[in-house]
Amino acid sequence: MLKKVFETTNLKDSFQVEIGTYARNVDSSILVRYQDTVVLTTMVFSRKPNNLDFLPLTVIYQEKLYAAGKIPGSFLRREGRSNDHEILTSRLIDRSLRPLFPDYFQQEVQVINTVLSLDPDFKSELASMLGSSLSLLISEIPFFEAISGVYVGKINNEFIINPTLQQLANSTLHLIVAGTKHNVTMIEAHANEVSEQDFLEAINFAHQYIKKLCLFQENIKQQFAPVKMTKTLHQTEQIQQQSFFAKNHSQVKQAILSCNSKNDLQQLKEQILDQAKQTPFFKTIDAITVFDYEAHKKHLQITENLFQKLSKQEMRSLILQEKIRPDKRELEEIRTLESQIDLLPRAHGSALFTRGKTQSLAAVTLGCLSESKIIDGLSDEQNKRFMLHYNFPPFSVGAVGRYTAPSRREIGHGTLAEKAISQVLPEEKDFPYTIRVVSEILESNGSSSQATVCSSSLALMASGVPLKKAVAGISVGLVFDQETNKYVILSDIQGLEDHVGDMDLKIAGTNKGITALQMDLKIQGIPFKILQEAFLQAKKGRLHILEQMNQTISQPRLEVSKYAPKVCMMQIKPEKIRDIIGSGGKIINQIIESHDGVKIDIEQDGRVFVMHSNLETVKKTVAFIESLIQEIQVGTCYQASILRFLSDKQGKMIGAVAQVCPGIEGLIHVNKMKFQKITDVLKIGETVLVKCTKINERGRIDFLLLPKKTQEKNS
């Protein structure tokens, strides 16, 4: 491969691309420099043909901690399995690229993006997307159009391309858009209740910048002039397809129109495959005729692929031409909705949300702030106090499957729902808890991630988390004939419609605006007009769902569950923190032990969070801490406990050490007492009333023991 270097011009940010210098055993090697961010993209594909009905594309995004000058914190001190950010970025790039591959290309492709250096203000995700696109574009793979991605923020009603971290912190919109020079192919965002119109304007704004980056890649492609792989359908394959379609057309259509289309289609498929198994295949080896297993296996695979193709064609035709959906709903009709709360007595909050044959059970757990998730990646270490986990067990689709670690899909769906809900959560100062929501998908027939948004919102309200507003989510689909430009937009798509459709647009939000969004396409783009219609149709469906949810619970409960821990926040002076912790944590451990294992979190700014399941224990702990940090004043009387007696080197009694609270001790000097033998009057552990008479420059305190009459009067 030729070694060449290219650089963008007339753009806000400068990208430099170096091709063919590194990792030269691959099909494509791209080094992308985006200011101080450096990403190496490699692409390798298999020459072995596959007879599959999908593209075996694998996109990997990996961060090396040396890119930010950090040593991994794990026991082995090396990078381990991919973290959530790496998985989500891998999915982001995959979803941007996949629509650009032709249906006939089914060879295995692996694109790996390795972050070698990182400037946090210049996103490695964008450099990876550029490198991934270019690696495919200059190869012989039939990937014909460049894609690029940009971030968009919004500050003071102005859109900003590729904002810095500081700008993003003040932005009401966090939007990532990917696309070709003609159309948008992928959208992902979370926002602070941003309107549909503002979103559409932001997407259009992003596309203007995307066009320039795509043209930059097209210019590089021209210099390499790659010869692309092509495929034409052979006459034998055409005849085989026509014969199969003619023979099974009416049966497939009838199965789709049945009341139980999904099961009927599956039964029909098994019936056709059983018939195909009866077809004999033989070959001759050394004048001996034997059964040809390979040919038989290939025949079954072709039959299954043809069935999938015919089913898709018939379903799309019914939707496009006759406006008939598999479950006979109207185009904008939402499936039957059901919801209930408080299913799990001991969980801190729970809700079940059912939409048609999709069902999500959400459970909420409230914990102390020290239980927040620590995120340690290339960026600075952060604490995450809200987590939403999505579980998709195989039984949810009536299948037998393996139980393993969360898949990339589960992590992606959970993060989307998490972003949707996080926009309406209370501030930490108003609700000092770590919040974990788990969504268990009990049934699935499409839109399970958006069912998770709904069940989570209901469960959080039921748990007493003061959400600003309820949040609902909906998936909108599209069937688009690119030859005639005829299209149909479908609200609340189910599994079959998602499978045969061209778009999956997931939008979650409140009655005011959008809080999270994700759009994936199976075609190379859609006109902006269709996107506008889809946004408005999604809004209509979202408001309908919110109305139904509000009938179950419309406002957060005023108190948390009786099983949830109670918390109290107090503000102290930062210099008083040491008085609570003590030497080696001695004092704070004493507080925890003497107050039934209470949890205490202390922040550097002086905020102290006290948490326990018993509210009285919380109050007693707070009162004790307040006594710890109180400042002794001369002339003020205090209850004190006698700790020990002091003697000088000759053994002569000096006085008694009295403790007002842990860390605050003073001396009752024998000279200030009217009796000679102090041990006759005081006993260790006895509580007495003392008066502070002096605090010297070194902080030493002198106490005066008050007469018993005064003590009795004060008691």
Curated annotation (Swiss-Prot):
Keywords: Cytoplasm, Magnesium, Metal-binding, Nucleotidyltransferase, RNA-binding, Transferase. GO terms for biological process: mRNA catabolic process. Residues 635-709 form the S1 motif domain. Its main location: cytoplasm. The keyword Repressor does not apply. Residues 565-625 form the KH domain. It is found in: Cytoplasm. It comes from the Bacteria. Mg(2+) binds at residues 498, 504. It is an enzyme of class 2 (transferase). SMART domains: KH, S1. PROSITE patterns: KH_TYPE_1 (PS50084), S1 (PS50126). It catalyses: RNA(n+1) + phosphate = RNA(n) + a ribonucleoside 5'-diphosphate. Its cofactor is Mg(2+). The keyword Cytoplasm applies. Its EC number is 2.7.7.8. One of its GO terms (cellular component) is cytosol. GO terms for molecular function: 3'-5'-RNA exonuclease activity; magnesium ion binding; polyribonucleotide nucleotidyltransferase activity; RNA binding. Involved in mRNA degradation. Catalyzes the phosphorolysis of single-stranded polyribonucleotides processively in the 3'- to 5'-direction. Belongs to the polyribonucleotide nucleotidyltransferase family. This is Polyribonucleotide nucleotidyltransferase. It comes from Aster yellows witches'-broom phytoplasma (strain AYWB). The lineage of its organism: Bacteria, Bacillati, Mycoplasmatota, Mollicutes, Acholeplasmatales.
